[in-house]
Amino acid sequence: YPDGNRKNFYDGKGHMDLEPDLNLCKSILSKSTLAHFNLMNWSRKLLPIAKDLGLKISCDLQDIVDINDPYREDFIKFADFIFFSTVNFSDPSSVIKNIQSKNSNPDLIIIVGMGKKGCVLATREKISFYKSIDLKKHPIIDTNGAGDELAVGFLSSFLFQKDSLENSIMRGQICARYTCSVKASTSNLITKNELETFWKELRKNPIKKE
């Protein structure tokens, strides 16, 4: 929509009854350190495998409508990192607390995309709200994929570069905001050099936390 809002329609076809080759999946996962899950029904069968292998587990709960939706329970239970969009909630605090009550990991980290309002970072200790960032000369064209890039930017910074939570949130927001400035396509993703250029510029005027 012109105001940046969106409505996505998903055709899952046979994903509810698909039976993955668990041995093959385990072999692939054994070579990994992080497993990022979306909500495909068959992928829930890989959650205990990833946990047993000691992988960090990240789950994208997408646009939550019902905070007590049983379909998402397994993904919430196994996750070390949880991402979701707050498009259906003006204040995500109640959703965050509900998720925390269903997950026993003391180090659980929750990241919430709030579109033009920014994003939220929640730990067991506190919930922090971050205002959105502005990438000059990069107007918003298409918001599809922004949530995915928020996750990619945050996880790669926090897990693989061992950066702080706040720096990782900024990198995630840069990736998400840049994605909104191009038509949705895997050929237009932000590069490492572009990310670093925006990072250095924004470090001069860091995003504000509320």
Where is each model-derived feature located?
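Conserved post-catalytic alpha-helical subdomain immediately downstream of the catalytic base
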Residues: 108, 135-206
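Ribokinase/PfkB-type carbohydrate-kinase core domain
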Residues: 1-129, 133, 163, 190-194, ...
